[in-house]
């Protein structure tokens, strides 16, 4: 079982991911913009008591703070620096930006194949479910 944070401003996408990943046995928390993600991670406001996820799935384009902004903040924080990030993007051209975000482990283009995403998450989590 892995702890996964899903962040997407499209609530139907976040809900579908939560349902799908929980079905695979993961514990999933959702947030709907970058600022909510920072709160869920215990970064802003600072809260060392918040559990650190094993994986963060972030949409690139979000209001308040985009996915790469969340990645940058995660990488600055010792507690979340090593959390792998899977980026969801509707714009394939955004993939090149991951060079500036060393914690981005993978990109998935929207719309995505749910089965392929589940397999990718399973592989990233070492088969933990």
Language model features: what each stretch is:
Residues 112-121:
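C-terminal output helix
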Residues 59, 89:
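Active-site residues of response regulator receiver
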Residues 15-23:
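Charged docking surfaces used in two-component/phosphorelay signaling
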Residues 51-54, 79-84:
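His-Asp phosphorelay/catalytic-motif detector in bacterial-type signaling
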Residues 30-55:
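Acidic, metal-coordinating helix/loop segments flanking the phosphotransfer/catalytic sites
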Residues 62:
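Receiver (REC) domain active-site loop signature in two-component systems and cognate sites
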């Amino acid at each position: 079982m892995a702890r996964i944070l899903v962040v997407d401003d499209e609530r139907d996408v976040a809900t579908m991911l939560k349902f799908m990943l929980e079905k695979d046995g993961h514990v999933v928390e959702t947030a709907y913009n970058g600022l909510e993600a920072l709160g869920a991670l215990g970064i802003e406001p600072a809260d060392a008591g918040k559990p650190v996820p094993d994986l963060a799935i972030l949409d690139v384009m979000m209001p308040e703070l985009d996915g790469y902004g969340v990645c940058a903040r995660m990488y600055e924080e010792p507690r979340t620096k090593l959390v792998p990030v899977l980026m969801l993007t509707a714009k394939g051209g955004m993939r090149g930006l991951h060079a500036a975000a060393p914690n981005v482990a993978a990109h998935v283009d929207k719309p995505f194949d749910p089965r392929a995403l589940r397999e990718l998450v399973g592989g990233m989590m070492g088969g933990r479910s």
